[in-house]
Swiss-Prot record:
The keyword Signal applies. It is found in: Secreted. This is Allatostatins. Residues 28-65, 121-151, 236-251, 268-345, 368-370 form a propeptide. Neuropeptide inhibitors of juvenile hormone synthesis and gut muscle contraction. Residues 29-58, 273-298 are annotated as: Disordered. One of its GO terms (cellular component) is extracellular region.
Length: 370
Protein backbone atom coordinates (compact mmCIF):
# COMPACT_ATOMS: atom_id res chain seq x y z
CA UNK A 1 0.00 0.00 0.00
CA UNK A 2 1.48 3.21 -1.06
CA UNK A 3 1.83 6.12 1.26
CA UNK A 4 1.55 9.84 0.54
CA UNK A 5 5.33 10.24 0.20
CA UNK A 6 5.54 7.80 -2.68
CA UNK A 7 2.78 9.62 -4.48
CA UNK A 8 4.75 12.85 -4.32
CA UNK A 9 8.04 11.30 -5.58
CA UNK A 10 6.61 9.67 -8.70
CA UNK A 11 5.46 12.88 -10.36
CA UNK A 12 8.76 14.59 -9.61
CA UNK A 13 10.69 11.73 -11.14
CA UNK A 14 8.61 11.86 -14.28
CA UNK A 15 9.28 15.58 -14.61
CA UNK A 16 13.01 15.05 -14.35
CA UNK A 17 12.95 12.32 -17.01
CA UNK A 18 11.05 14.54 -19.39
CA UNK A 19 13.48 17.43 -18.88
CA UNK A 20 16.45 15.22 -19.59
CA UNK A 21 14.89 13.90 -22.77
CA UNK A 22 14.07 17.38 -23.99
CA UNK A 23 17.61 18.65 -23.43
CA UNK A 24 19.14 15.69 -25.23
CA UNK A 25 16.84 16.22 -28.18
CA UNK A 26 17.79 19.89 -28.43
CA UNK A 27 21.58 19.08 -28.30
CA UNK A 28 21.40 16.71 -31.29
CA UNK A 29 19.57 19.19 -33.50
CA UNK A 30 21.73 20.85 -36.27
CA UNK A 31 22.58 24.48 -35.80
CA UNK A 32 22.00 26.99 -38.59
CA UNK A 33 24.96 28.02 -40.74
CA UNK A 34 24.77 31.61 -39.64
CA UNK A 35 25.09 33.70 -36.56
CA UNK A 36 21.93 35.32 -35.30
CA UNK A 37 22.59 38.95 -34.54
CA UNK A 38 20.28 41.83 -34.20
CA UNK A 39 20.38 44.39 -36.94
CA UNK A 40 21.26 48.00 -36.12
CA UNK A 41 17.69 48.97 -37.06
CA UNK A 42 16.34 46.85 -34.25
CA UNK A 43 14.08 44.06 -35.55
CA UNK A 44 14.99 40.71 -36.97
CA UNK A 45 18.20 38.86 -37.34
CA UNK A 46 20.76 38.52 -40.20
CA UNK A 47 23.11 35.73 -41.05
CA UNK A 48 26.76 37.02 -41.51
CA UNK A 49 29.48 34.76 -43.02
CA UNK A 50 32.66 33.91 -41.10
CA UNK A 51 36.02 35.70 -42.13
CA UNK A 52 37.65 32.33 -42.79
CA UNK A 53 35.21 31.62 -45.58
CA UNK A 54 36.25 34.74 -47.56
CA UNK A 55 38.29 34.06 -50.73
CA UNK A 56 40.87 36.22 -52.53
CA UNK A 57 38.41 36.94 -55.33
CA UNK A 58 35.78 38.16 -52.88
CA UNK A 59 38.23 40.55 -51.02
CA UNK A 60 41.27 41.66 -53.20
CA UNK A 61 42.37 44.38 -50.73
CA UNK A 62 43.09 41.78 -48.09
CA UNK A 63 45.27 39.85 -50.54
CA UNK A 64 47.30 42.99 -51.41
CA UNK A 65 47.97 43.72 -47.74
CA UNK A 66 49.09 40.14 -47.31
CA UNK A 67 51.63 40.56 -50.13
CA UNK A 68 53.19 43.66 -48.57
CA UNK A 69 54.14 41.75 -45.41
CA UNK A 70 55.69 38.69 -46.97
CA UNK A 71 59.15 39.32 -45.46
CA UNK A 72 61.80 37.05 -44.07
CA UNK A 73 65.15 35.48 -44.91
CA UNK A 74 65.38 35.02 -48.64
CA UNK A 75 61.70 35.84 -49.11
CA UNK A 76 60.42 37.06 -52.41
CA UNK A 77 57.47 39.40 -52.41
CA UNK A 78 55.39 39.30 -55.57
CA UNK A 79 53.31 42.05 -57.02
CA UNK A 80 51.27 39.78 -59.34
CA UNK A 81 48.91 36.89 -58.76
CA UNK A 82 50.87 34.69 -61.12
CA UNK A 83 53.79 34.83 -58.64
CA UNK A 84 56.44 35.09 -61.40
CA UNK A 85 57.40 38.73 -60.91
CA UNK A 86 59.54 40.18 -58.16
CA UNK A 87 58.50 43.23 -56.22
CA UNK A 88 61.43 45.70 -56.68
CA UNK A 89 60.48 47.91 -53.74
CA UNK A 90 60.41 45.30 -50.98
CA UNK A 91 62.87 42.69 -52.13
CA UNK A 92 64.91 42.47 -48.93
CA UNK A 93 66.95 39.66 -47.48
CA UNK A 94 70.35 37.98 -47.76
CA UNK A 95 71.84 37.95 -51.24
CA UNK A 96 69.07 40.05 -52.70
CA UNK A 97 69.67 42.35 -55.63
CA UNK A 98 67.78 45.58 -55.81
CA UNK A 99 68.58 48.42 -58.18
CA UNK A 100 67.70 51.23 -55.84
CA UNK A 101 69.04 49.85 -52.56
CA UNK A 102 71.82 47.40 -53.39
CA UNK A 103 74.03 47.97 -50.34
CA UNK A 104 76.34 45.49 -48.75
CA UNK A 105 79.51 43.57 -49.52
CA UNK A 106 80.09 42.91 -53.18
CA UNK A 107 76.91 44.67 -54.23
CA UNK A 108 76.59 46.35 -57.58
CA UNK A 109 74.17 49.16 -57.24
CA UNK A 110 73.13 52.39 -58.88
CA UNK A 111 75.53 55.03 -60.06
CA UNK A 112 74.69 57.53 -57.36
CA UNK A 113 76.11 55.43 -54.50
CA UNK A 114 79.03 53.35 -55.68
CA UNK A 115 80.57 52.73 -52.26
CA UNK A 116 82.52 49.78 -51.00
CA UNK A 117 85.85 48.04 -51.35
CA UNK A 118 87.44 48.23 -54.77
CA UNK A 119 84.38 49.70 -56.44
CA UNK A 120 84.67 51.06 -59.94
CA UNK A 121 82.55 53.76 -61.44
CA UNK A 122 80.38 52.91 -64.36
CA UNK A 123 81.53 56.08 -66.10
CA UNK A 124 85.17 54.97 -66.11
CA UNK A 125 84.78 51.81 -68.17
CA UNK A 126 86.99 52.13 -71.20
CA UNK A 127 88.45 55.48 -70.07
CA UNK A 128 91.70 54.41 -68.45
CA UNK A 129 93.70 55.81 -71.36
CA UNK A 130 92.08 59.21 -71.08
CA UNK A 131 93.71 59.87 -67.70
CA UNK A 132 97.21 59.53 -69.10
CA UNK A 133 96.39 61.66 -72.10
CA UNK A 134 94.98 64.44 -69.98
CA UNK A 135 97.97 64.32 -67.63
CA UNK A 136 100.28 65.10 -70.54
CA UNK A 137 97.87 67.28 -72.48
CA UNK A 138 96.54 70.78 -71.99
CA UNK A 139 97.24 72.62 -68.76
CA UNK A 140 94.03 74.65 -68.62
CA UNK A 141 90.50 73.28 -68.40
CA UNK A 142 87.73 74.96 -70.29
CA UNK A 143 84.48 75.80 -68.57
CA UNK A 144 82.62 73.25 -70.66
CA UNK A 145 84.97 70.48 -69.49
CA UNK A 146 84.42 71.44 -65.87
CA UNK A 147 80.69 71.26 -66.42
CA UNK A 148 81.01 67.82 -67.95
CA UNK A 149 82.97 66.58 -64.95
CA UNK A 150 80.35 67.92 -62.56
CA UNK A 151 77.52 66.36 -64.59
CA UNK A 152 79.02 62.92 -64.26
CA UNK A 153 77.33 61.06 -61.48
CA UNK A 154 79.91 58.84 -59.96
CA UNK A 155 83.02 60.97 -60.36
CA UNK A 156 82.17 63.14 -57.37
CA UNK A 157 81.15 60.25 -55.12
CA UNK A 158 83.56 57.49 -55.99
CA UNK A 159 85.02 56.84 -52.55
CA UNK A 160 86.75 53.84 -51.09
CA UNK A 161 89.94 51.87 -51.61
CA UNK A 162 91.37 52.07 -55.09
CA UNK A 163 89.01 54.82 -56.19
CA UNK A 164 89.94 57.22 -58.94
CA UNK A 165 88.40 60.66 -58.74
CA UNK A 166 89.59 63.37 -61.09
CA UNK A 167 88.67 66.59 -59.27
CA UNK A 168 90.29 65.50 -55.97
CA UNK A 169 93.38 63.49 -56.74
CA UNK A 170 95.12 63.72 -53.36
CA UNK A 171 97.56 61.33 -51.78
CA UNK A 172 101.05 59.99 -52.30
CA UNK A 173 102.31 60.07 -55.84
CA UNK A 174 99.02 61.25 -57.27
CA UNK A 175 98.81 62.73 -60.71
CA UNK A 176 96.18 65.36 -61.28
CA UNK A 177 95.36 65.60 -64.99
CA UNK A 178 93.33 68.78 -64.71
CA UNK A 179 95.00 72.15 -65.12
CA UNK A 180 93.43 73.45 -61.93
CA UNK A 181 95.46 70.95 -59.92
CA UNK A 182 98.80 72.15 -61.25
CA UNK A 183 98.99 74.83 -58.56
CA UNK A 184 98.62 72.33 -55.71
CA UNK A 185 100.98 69.46 -56.47
CA UNK A 186 101.85 68.52 -52.90
CA UNK A 187 103.41 65.35 -51.64
CA UNK A 188 106.64 63.43 -52.04
CA UNK A 189 108.33 63.96 -55.37
CA UNK A 190 105.58 66.22 -56.65
CA UNK A 191 106.11 68.65 -59.45
CA UNK A 192 103.64 71.46 -59.04
CA UNK A 193 103.14 75.00 -60.19
CA UNK A 194 105.63 77.80 -60.08
CA UNK A 195 104.47 79.64 -56.97
CA UNK A 196 103.77 76.80 -54.53
CA UNK A 197 106.14 73.97 -55.37
CA UNK A 198 106.93 72.73 -51.86
CA UNK A 199 108.27 69.44 -50.68
CA UNK A 200 111.44 67.37 -50.78
CA UNK A 201 113.49 67.70 -53.93
CA UNK A 202 111.12 70.18 -55.50
CA UNK A 203 112.05 72.14 -58.54
CA UNK A 204 110.08 75.33 -58.49
CA UNK A 205 109.99 77.91 -61.21
CA UNK A 206 109.31 80.61 -58.65
CA UNK A 207 112.63 82.30 -57.98
CA UNK A 208 111.69 83.88 -54.70
CA UNK A 209 110.51 80.62 -53.10
CA UNK A 210 112.90 77.92 -54.24
CA UNK A 211 113.25 76.23 -50.85
CA UNK A 212 114.41 72.75 -50.13
CA UNK A 213 117.53 70.63 -50.10
CA UNK A 214 120.11 71.43 -52.72
CA UNK A 215 118.17 74.20 -54.41
CA UNK A 216 119.78 76.23 -57.14
CA UNK A 217 118.14 79.59 -57.78
CA UNK A 218 118.08 80.95 -61.29
CA UNK A 219 120.50 83.73 -62.02
CA UNK A 220 118.30 86.74 -62.75
CA UNK A 221 119.66 89.59 -60.66
CA UNK A 222 119.51 90.55 -57.00
CA UNK A 223 115.78 91.20 -56.98
CA UNK A 224 114.78 87.61 -57.76
CA UNK A 225 116.84 84.87 -56.15
CA UNK A 226 120.00 86.49 -54.89
CA UNK A 227 118.86 87.50 -51.42
CA UNK A 228 117.16 84.23 -50.56
CA UNK A 229 119.62 81.48 -51.39
CA UNK A 230 118.75 79.13 -48.54
CA UNK A 231 119.60 75.50 -48.15
CA UNK A 232 122.57 73.17 -48.09
CA UNK A 233 125.22 73.63 -50.74
CA UNK A 234 123.76 76.70 -52.38
CA UNK A 235 125.40 78.32 -55.33
CA UNK A 236 125.17 82.05 -55.56
CA UNK A 237 124.94 82.74 -59.28
CA UNK A 238 124.47 86.48 -59.14
CA UNK A 239 128.09 87.40 -58.31
CA UNK A 240 129.95 89.33 -60.97
CA UNK A 241 133.07 87.21 -61.47
CA UNK A 242 134.55 89.65 -63.96
CA UNK A 243 134.70 92.36 -61.35
CA UNK A 244 136.31 90.00 -58.88
CA UNK A 245 138.85 88.84 -61.44
CA UNK A 246 139.91 92.43 -62.05
CA UNK A 247 140.27 93.07 -58.32
CA UNK A 248 142.39 89.96 -57.75
CA UNK A 249 144.30 89.98 -61.02
CA UNK A 250 147.45 91.21 -59.30
CA UNK A 251 147.44 88.29 -56.83
CA UNK A 252 146.33 85.71 -59.46
CA UNK A 253 144.09 84.04 -56.92
CA UNK A 254 140.32 83.68 -57.21
CA UNK A 255 137.94 83.65 -54.28
CA UNK A 256 136.46 80.18 -54.36
CA UNK A 257 134.00 80.89 -51.59
CA UNK A 258 132.07 83.20 -53.87
CA UNK A 259 130.99 80.24 -55.93
CA UNK A 260 129.91 78.03 -53.05
CA UNK A 261 128.48 79.86 -50.04
CA UNK A 262 127.59 77.06 -47.64
CA UNK A 263 125.90 77.28 -44.29
CA UNK A 264 122.84 78.64 -42.57
CA UNK A 265 122.06 82.38 -42.51
CA UNK A 266 124.22 83.57 -45.37
CA UNK A 267 124.43 87.24 -46.09
CA UNK A 268 125.35 88.63 -49.43
CA UNK A 269 127.73 91.54 -49.46
CA UNK A 270 126.35 94.75 -50.85
CA UNK A 271 128.59 96.72 -53.24
CA UNK A 272 129.11 99.49 -50.67
CA UNK A 273 129.99 97.02 -47.93
CA UNK A 274 132.21 95.10 -50.29
CA UNK A 275 134.29 98.18 -51.04
CA UNK A 276 134.44 99.14 -47.36
CA UNK A 277 135.59 95.68 -46.33
CA UNK A 278 138.16 95.60 -49.11
CA UNK A 279 139.64 98.97 -48.06
CA UNK A 280 139.68 97.92 -44.43
CA UNK A 281 141.49 94.70 -45.26
CA UNK A 282 144.10 96.50 -47.27
CA UNK A 283 144.86 98.82 -44.37
CA UNK A 284 144.92 96.01 -41.84
CA UNK A 285 147.06 93.79 -44.03
CA UNK A 286 149.68 96.49 -44.47
CA UNK A 287 149.86 97.09 -40.72
CA UNK A 288 149.97 93.37 -40.05
CA UNK A 289 152.82 92.82 -42.51
CA UNK A 290 154.87 95.55 -40.93
CA UNK A 291 154.50 94.07 -37.46
CA UNK A 292 154.98 90.37 -38.25
CA UNK A 293 157.03 90.53 -41.48
CA UNK A 294 154.80 87.90 -43.08
CA UNK A 295 154.07 87.28 -46.73
CA UNK A 296 151.12 88.54 -48.74
CA UNK A 297 149.51 85.15 -48.37
CA UNK A 298 147.84 86.12 -45.12
CA UNK A 299 146.60 89.45 -46.36
CA UNK A 300 145.16 87.93 -49.51
CA UNK A 301 143.59 85.20 -47.45
CA UNK A 302 141.98 87.65 -45.08
CA UNK A 303 140.66 89.71 -47.97
CA UNK A 304 139.02 86.67 -49.49
CA UNK A 305 137.63 85.65 -46.16
CA UNK A 306 136.11 89.06 -45.48
CA UNK A 307 134.41 89.59 -48.84
CA UNK A 308 131.68 87.20 -47.84
CA UNK A 309 130.50 85.82 -44.51
CA UNK A 310 131.72 82.27 -43.98
CA UNK A 311 129.43 81.30 -41.08
CA UNK A 312 129.03 77.72 -40.05
CA UNK A 313 130.79 74.89 -38.28
CA UNK A 314 134.24 73.79 -39.41
CA UNK A 315 134.38 75.87 -42.52
CA UNK A 316 137.28 75.75 -44.95
CA UNK A 317 137.51 79.43 -45.59
CA UNK A 318 140.03 79.38 -48.40
CA UNK A 319 142.26 76.96 -50.15
CA UNK A 320 146.00 76.94 -49.83
CA UNK A 321 148.08 78.70 -52.41
CA UNK A 322 150.79 76.12 -52.88
CA UNK A 323 153.22 78.63 -54.37
CA UNK A 324 152.87 80.94 -51.43
CA UNK A 325 152.63 78.10 -48.92
CA UNK A 326 155.99 76.82 -50.06
CA UNK A 327 157.47 80.02 -48.73
CA UNK A 328 157.13 78.54 -45.25
CA UNK A 329 160.07 76.30 -46.07
CA UNK A 330 162.16 79.09 -47.52
CA UNK A 331 165.16 80.61 -45.84
CA UNK A 332 163.29 83.87 -45.19
CA UNK A 333 161.10 82.22 -42.57
CA UNK A 334 163.81 80.45 -40.64
CA UNK A 335 163.52 82.97 -37.82
CA UNK A 336 159.71 82.70 -37.41
CA UNK A 337 158.63 82.39 -33.82
CA UNK A 338 156.40 79.48 -32.74
CA UNK A 339 153.44 81.83 -32.13
CA UNK A 340 153.65 83.26 -35.64
CA UNK A 341 153.98 79.80 -37.13
CA UNK A 342 150.91 78.47 -35.26
CA UNK A 343 148.92 81.50 -36.36
CA UNK A 344 149.90 80.95 -39.99
CA UNK A 345 148.93 77.28 -39.85
CA UNK A 346 145.64 77.97 -38.08
CA UNK A 347 144.32 80.47 -40.60
CA UNK A 348 143.24 78.14 -43.42
CA UNK A 349 141.06 76.16 -40.98
CA UNK A 350 139.42 78.79 -38.84
CA UNK A 351 136.34 76.82 -37.82
CA UNK A 352 133.85 77.16 -35.00
CA UNK A 353 130.58 78.87 -34.15
CA UNK A 354 130.50 82.56 -35.05
CA UNK A 355 133.28 83.30 -37.52
CA UNK A 356 135.33 86.35 -37.04
CA UNK A 357 135.73 88.76 -39.91
CA UNK A 358 136.98 92.37 -39.85
CA UNK A 359 133.52 93.92 -39.58
CA UNK A 360 131.94 91.26 -37.35
CA UNK A 361 134.46 89.88 -34.90
CA UNK A 362 132.17 87.76 -32.72
CA UNK A 363 131.93 84.19 -31.57
CA UNK A 364 132.35 81.89 -28.60
CA UNK A 365 135.89 81.76 -27.30
CA UNK A 366 137.35 83.43 -30.37
CA UNK A 367 140.70 85.16 -30.37
CA UNK A 368 140.98 88.23 -32.46
CA UNK A 369 144.24 88.33 -34.39
CA UNK A 370 144.25 92.08 -34.80
Amino acid sequence: MSGPRTCFCLPSALVLVLLSLSTSALGTAPEPSGVHEESPAGGGTDLLPHPEDLSASDNPDLEFVKRLYDFGLGKRAYSYVSEYKRLPVYNFGLGKRSKMYGFGLGKRDGRMYSFGLGKRDYDYYGEEDEDDQQAIGDEDIEESDVGDLMDKRDRLYSFGLGKRARPYSFGLGKRAPSGAQRLYGFGLGKRGGSLYSFGLGKRGDGRLYAFGLGKRPVNSGRSSGSRFNFGLGKRSDDIDFRELEEKFAEDKRYPQEHRFSFGLGKREVEPSELEAVRNEEKDNSSVHDKKNNTNDMHSGERIKRSLHYPFGIRKLESSYDLNSASSLNSEENDDITPEEFSRMVRRPFNFGLGKRIPMYDFGIGKRSER
